[in-house]
Amino acid sequence: MDETSPLVSPDRDQTDYSYQSQCSPGVPVCLSPNGRFSAVPGVVVRIPGSATSPIRGSAASGPSPPGSPCDRERQPLLERSQTRGAAAQAERERNKFPDDPEFAEVVKKAEKAIVRDILPERISQGSSGSYFVKNEQGEIIAVFKPKNEEPYGQLNPKWTKWLQKLCCPCCFGRDCLVLNQGYLSEAGASLVDQKLELNIVPRTKVVFLASETFNYSAIDRVKSRGKRLALEKVPKVGQRFNRIGLPPKVGSFQLFVKGYKDADYWLRRFEADPLPENTNRQLQLQFERLVVLDYIIRNTDRGNDNWLIKYDCPMDSASARDDWVMVKEPVIKIAAIDNGLAFPLKHPDSWRAYPFYWAWLPQAKIQFSQEIKDLILPKISDPNFVKDLEEDLYELFKRDPGFDRGQFRKQIAVMRGQILNLTQALKDGKSPLQLVQTPPVIVETARSHQKSTSESYTQSFQSRKPFFSWW
């Protein structure tokens, strides 16, 4: 018996293994008449690429079309996985706001302006990288604050926070806040404002933008230039890149408000030149809305220089031929900007208390008006409304790659406590000053081993005070 011939059991039917007898000359292996391989299991065979092959199909048909099963089989698994991942990432970075077409239109204008090299301009004030976004006419339409350029972000272009971290690391950051979540805090404040119908926060949402004026790492800029060069010199290679330009940055996109000035400027003017009674009433009502917003989100960075006042006292000419004029009633509006340091996971209890600086204003000593009670109390007294607010914030905050459910529960527990105190203060007819003097409360969801259709909560007071307390 030849050593190279296959071993066959003596009891097995003798099968003809003379492959050449059933095949055309030059073909080492062929199929048996019944369409099966005429070979012993375990023997390596080579299947001919003939036109009658039931597996390969027609050899003359050429390469398989893209997307066909054969084409997908030939594509490496790693490459397919990377392609799907790149497509998913591109979908996440697409700015879509179906529920707010007006906001979507502003974002589209900003994107078109960037394509035409009308780039965002960095704002010199502040301790983080923030930018004035313009339209194609060069007009400022929004303020964009990238996540990684926040006060404690890795690419913050302002050196003040870097110097603070280097020289005084023990006082660096705010331990009551979730770091690098300022863009979500900005968008969350706008969400709370809309839910409560306060209408004092310019609409703010999470947006992806890319611009040469943003602060990128050297590696990102080199990669971008290399990809552009490859696309110009070797188009076949450059077309395989998922992205050619700089990577988009995620951040808060807040609509720009015109005609406003720092509150400190107008408050000094009003102190020297008191407002008429009706106008002063408008200011008080707007101020109370600011108090409600700041208190619920527990804003840790509210001074008199980061909220705005617009004071209009228009005069229309009644006739061009005489000096008669019609004086309209002045209009006052407040815009609450810079909400990036809110939604703490605990009440401040370390070095600083981070007070509300509006608490020292004369307006803070006046009891809450009936108008603000009628607007706010029916909402925050309704458990279903509060639950919906929590769910909306959850859908917003979970978009962050570093989202932590445990930290979010702590943030919501603080917010529930603030809502509880505010509800009681409005019912008792207190003033904003008396409200901020109320002991801070945390309302957590109670853990139960038994299933229940309704949630229960536990209430606790914070006994520890900051080292530098303001009361």
Curated annotation (Swiss-Prot):
Pfam family of the protein (one): PI3_PI4_kinase
Membrane-related topology note = Lipid-anchor
Subcellular location(s): the record lists: Golgi apparatus, trans-Golgi network membrane; Membrane raft; Endosome; Endosome membrane
The domain of life is Eukaryota
Which reactions is this enzyme annotated as catalysing? a 1,2-diacyl-sn-glycero-3-phospho-(1D-myo-inositol) + ATP = a 1,2-diacyl-sn-glycero-3-phospho-(1D-myo-inositol 4-phosphate) + ADP + H(+)
Q: Give GO cellular component annotations, separated by semicolons.
A: cytoplasmic vesicle; dendrite; endosome; endosome membrane; Golgi apparatus; growing cell tip; membrane; membrane raft
- Main subcellular location: Golgi
Q: Where is the PI3K/PI4K catalytic domain?
A: 117-445
Q: Which UniProt keywords apply?
A: ATP-binding, Cell membrane, Cell projection, Cytoplasmic vesicle, Endosome, Golgi apparatus, Kinase, Lipid metabolism, Lipoprotein, Membrane, Mitochondrion, Nucleotide-binding, Palmitate, Phosphoprotein, Synapse, Synaptosome, Transferase
Q: Which GO terms describe its molecular function?
A: 1-phosphatidylinositol 4-kinase activity; AP-3 adaptor complex binding; ATP binding
> Does this entry carry the keyword Nucleotidyltransferase?
no
Chain residue ranges for the region called Activation loop = 336-356
Mark out the compositionally biased spans (Basic and acidic residues).
90-101
Residues with lipidation of kind S-palmitoyl cysteine: 167-168, 170-171
Q: Which residues bind ATP?
A: 124-130, 145, 254-257, 338
Residue numbers spanned by region Important for interaction with membranes: 158-171, 261-269, 351-360
Stretches the record annotates as Catalytic loop: 298-306
Query: Record keywords: Phosphoprotein included?
Result: yes
Q: Where is this region: Disordered?
A: 1-25, 48-101
Q: Where is this region: Important for substrate binding?
A: 150-152
Q: What is its EC number?
A: 2.7.1.67
**Record GO biological process:** phosphatidylinositol biosynthetic process; phosphatidylinositol phosphate biosynthetic process
Q: What does this protein do?
A: Membrane-bound phosphatidylinositol-4 kinase (PI4-kinase) that catalyzes the phosphorylation of phosphatidylinositol (PI) to phosphatidylinositol 4-phosphate (PI4P), a lipid that plays important roles in endocytosis, Golgi function, protein sorting and membrane trafficking. Besides, phosphorylation of phosphatidylinositol (PI) to phosphatidylinositol 4-phosphate (PI4P) is the first committed step in the generation of phosphatidylinositol 4,5-bisphosphate (PIP2), a precursor of the second messenger inositol 1,4,5-trisphosphate (InsP3).
Q: Which family does it belong to?
A: Belongs to the PI3/PI4-kinase family. Type II PI4K subfamily.
The protein here is known as Phosphatidylinositol 4-kinase type 2-alpha
The record lists the lineage as: Eukaryota, Metazoa, Chordata, Craniata, Vertebrata
